[in-house]
Amino acid sequence: VEYGYQYLVDGTIKIGDPYATKILDPWNDKWINASVYPNLKAYPAEYTSDIVSVFELNPAEFNWTATSYERPAENSLAIYELLVRDFTEEGSINAVTAKLDYLETLGVNAIELMPIQEFDGNDSWGYNPCFFFAADKAYGTEEAYKTFIDECHKRDIAVIIDVVFN
């Protein structure tokens, strides 16, 4: 079960939790395709405005399968930097996962994801993050991100995440 919450500062300012791992955005979530993020919790417009933080009680455990992964030596990295939004037509982490065999044939042993943290809007390179611990829902679910990492590790591909602390 997921719950939404906000902090009320000085009785008038509503803000999301800066440490939240998921947020609801009244302006941008409506543009997220249900095939990319199925069952996205609806924004509680009848109760509030601005960003709402989300937490989940007893989330399902992810079953990591690439348990013997070892990262490549730093001096042997062949890094492919990509922006999830532009790498495929769908612009989702699931679509990137579907292209891992192709990247592997190129000799890639590390993928650097351009920023994937939540940022203002859905059309940006992500260098304007606003919630550093929340992966961008426009690219997919938390499980989809974990599946991507697990599938990379099955192929001995490291995952590097580009972060910007503005």
Name these PLM-found stretches.
Residues 1-79:
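The feature marks proteins involved in alpha-glucan
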Residues 67-68, 97-107:
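Short amphipathic alpha-helices and their capping/turn segments at secondary-structure boundaries
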Residues 71-76, 104-106, 153-154:
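Extracellular/periplasmic catalytic domains that process cell-envelope and extracellular macromolecules
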Residues 78-82, 111-113, 159-161:
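Hydrophobic faces of well-ordered beta-strands that scaffold small-molecule active sites
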Residues 80-94, 128-142, 158:
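The substrate-binding groove and active-site-proximal loops of carbohydrate-active enzymes
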Residues 102-146:
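Aromatic-lined carbohydrate-binding/catalytic grooves of carbohydrate-active enzymes
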Residues 103, 146-164:
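Conserved beta-strand->loop/alpha-helix structural units within folded catalytic cores of enzymes
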Residues 119, 163-166:
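Aromatic-lined carbohydrate-binding surfaces of glycoside hydrolases
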